[in-house]
A protein has these predicted regions:
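Signature of N-terminal electron-transfer/Fe-S-associated modules in redox systems
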Residues: 1-147
């Protein structure tokens, strides 16, 4: 991966995403290892992690449900969608279901303003959602995750 980027610092975000996909979250050990390999301080790595909402230092569920509540989504029902997901999954912001299948996050923007309200589950976008539509989305992931 290093050969595709001009500097070691520029490979940090893709490397963090790869490590997180492999391990499930960015543990202290992963952060230390990446900092050493990329010749960065652990503080440099942690600063980048804290900036991006898709990166986490805590274990998440198999499916990370990110509900956008920025202005476009908010005006079209994003907050109500978040509340609906909280009730449906039985968890709140930054929570994980007891079976480890779902995590839920409120996020500021996922770049899908034209299709608001929108939710991102892992790397998949779901747009123009209603409570009924998000129920179907969550049920589909639930079935897939239990197979």
């Amino acid at each position: 991966m290093l050969t595709h980027y001009p500097t070691k610092r520029s490979v940090l975000v893709p490397t963090l995403l790869y490590a997180q996909d492999e391990v499930g979250f960015l543990s202290d050990e992963v952060i230390s290892e990446l900092a050493g390999r990329l010749e960065l301080t652990e503080l440099d790595v942690r600063n980048v992690i804290s900036y991006y909402s898709m990166l986490t230092t805590r274990p998440r569920g198999k499916y990370n449900v990110q509900v956008c509540t920025n202005i476009a989504c908010l005006l079209r029902g994003g907050e109500e969608l978040l509340e609906h997901c909280e009730r449906k999954l039985g968890i709140r912001h930054k929570g994980t279901t007891s079976d480890g299948l779902f995590s839920l996050e409120e996020v500021e923007c996922i770049g899908a303003c034209s299709w608001a309200p929108a939710v991102q589950v892992n790397y998949d976008f779901h747009e123009n959602l209603t409570p009924e539509k998000i129920d179907r989305v969550l049920e589909d992931y639930g079935r897939k995750g239990r197979q």
